[in-house]
């Protein structure tokens, strides 16, 4: 069967994979019903494009990274998400991709971005599931009997900072900091992407993001000599570009305000810096470190940081 699936005269395998990769980057596939691609599915919006990408994918040796590079370097992917009146009139659902779709990044990627930019992310590949920071309360209601009780054994050391791919996932409940994740009690082909106050509260208060902000603040403090350079470096690490327009002034203003807050409240500074298992550099003054931590946490929560624009 495997040989049959990958024979040159069997085009469906390549088309299905190409369509799913397209869905990953654009929010929906060239064939909208990615779970049912065939004679009963929706018709492709761009049939020739689907066929061409499928042939390219097959002839590249089924290399997924090559396919992804082809998609993300295309003019279609790199165009603006700004919607004009003409777009809304002629193609309100953007089926023809006259502009880029605007998507919130999946929570797994948001967590990995925070860990990567701060320098906490563990590069280890493979191994058993890990147990990153999670509140205990969601698990208590799942204990049917004492014998089947489950306590969450939080990981230690580098395992706390593994990629989200390796996070332990119980069938009846998804990790609570993974927004819109399926509970896996039913099969879901696509994850719904929503935006709610609960998501914002999580990213502002969850130890994962607070600790990442603290470590990022520590990192840029060591790497750069001035406030301006530190803020620019943190901005670039989180958003992948240099701050522009009014952004440098706004960041500097926030840092100044946070300095005043934590200079007047040493206990609040120490409490903020105590979040997370990683050790902080005590040579950095607490009020200064806390102020830059709060600023870095704001960077992680910017719309531009959580949205693919």
Task: Show which residues each predicted segment covers.
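Short, surface-exposed polybasic-aromatic patches that bind anionic ligands, especially phosphate groups
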Residues: 295
